[in-house]
């Protein structure tokens, strides 16, 4: 399966073995553009500018929704699958309990400027990483919620860092500000 989210408010599941150009399933619950899609085992997690994160359990066909109060630019699972990291247009990254929806932490300081910023956890589930409009990567301790570091390996830093990807097993991640892509080691935070 390939899963896509779109500005037309839909999430489509495509069977790549099929000879048809039609999606196998279309999920139309979002009321505004779908900003991110993440998949973990049997769950599909979507974020939308309608202010909601939606978690589809495709094993049993159930939908779980949490309202965040502002447009959601990115949502991702923690590595242990127990929590969800949520970036919102209000400039706050939130850590939510996946099952109860309880707010476990808020991470602030980075600059959102209404950009569609991505955030994630590191490989060990100990740090929150987020892009920022100030051209830096902001990293917080997951438990204390304090800023660990701000990485600024991009020269010049006039471009916002909007996209990042954490390697699922190795202690490294990639980030881009548009014209450049850099890789960091999360253990030493060296470029």
Roles of regions detected by a PLM:
Residues 1-3, 42-45, 62, 81-85, ...:
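Structural hallmark of WD40 beta-propellers
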Residues 5, 23-29, 63-68, 103-110, ...:
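Short C-terminal beta-strands that terminate individual repeats in beta-propeller domains
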Residues 5-8, 47-50, 87-90, 131-134, ...:
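Conserved strand-to-loop turn within each blade of WD40 beta-propeller repeats
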Residues 11-16, 53-57, 93-97, 137-141, ...:
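WD40-repeat beta-propellers
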Residues 18-20, 60-62, 100-102, 144-146, ...:
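Short coil turn/linker residues within repeat-based beta-strand modules
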Residues 31-39, 70-77, 113-120, 158-165:
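Canonical WD40 repeat/beta-propeller blade segments in eukaryotic WD-repeat proteins
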Residues 87, 91, 102, 110-142:
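Loop/turn-rich, solvent-exposed surfaces of beta-rich toroidal or solenoidal domains
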Residues 162-191:
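Blade-level signature of beta-propeller repeat domains, shared across WD40, Kelch, NHL, RCC1
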């Amino acid at each position: 399966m390939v899963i896509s989210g779109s500005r037309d408010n839909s999430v489509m599941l495509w069977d790549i073995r099929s000879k048809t150009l039609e999606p196998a399933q279309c999920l139309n619950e979002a009321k505004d553009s779908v900003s991110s899609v993440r998949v973990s085992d049997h769950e599909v997690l979507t974020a939308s500018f309608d202010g909601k994160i939606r978690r589809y359990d495709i094993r049993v066909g159930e939908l779980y929704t949490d309202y965040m109060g502002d447009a959601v630019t990115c949502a991702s699972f923690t590595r242990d699958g127990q929590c969800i990291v949520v970036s919102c247009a209000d400039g706050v990254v939130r850590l939510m309990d996946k099952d109860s929806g309880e707010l476990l932490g808020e991470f602030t300081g980075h600059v959102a400027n209404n950009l569609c910023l991505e955030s994630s956890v590191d490989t060990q589930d100990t740090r929150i990483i987020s892009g920022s409009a100030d051209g830096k990567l902001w990293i917080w301790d997951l438990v204390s919620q304090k800023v660990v570091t701000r990485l600024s390996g991009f020269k010049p830093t006039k471009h916002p860092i909007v996209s990042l990807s954490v390697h699922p097993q190795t202690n490294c991640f990639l980030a881009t500000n548009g014209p450049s892509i850099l890789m960091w080691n999360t253990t030493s935070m060296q470029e």
